[in-house]
């Protein structure tokens, strides 16, 4: 949509555009 969703990765939080 335009919002960003943060996911917990091995190195930390990686924000990616949620569609």
From Swiss-Prot:
Organism: Striatophasma naukluftense
Name of the protein this chain belongs to: CAPA-Periviscerokinin-2
Location of Valine amide modifications: 19
Role according to the record: Mediates visceral muscle contractile activity (myotropic activity).
Keyword Secreted part of the UniProt annotation: yes
Superkingdom of origin organism: Eukaryota
Family of the protein in this entry: Belongs to the periviscerokinin family.
Keyword terms: Amidation, Neuropeptide, Secreted
One GO location term (cellular component): extracellular region
Protein location: Secreted
GO annotation, biological process: neuropeptide signaling pathway
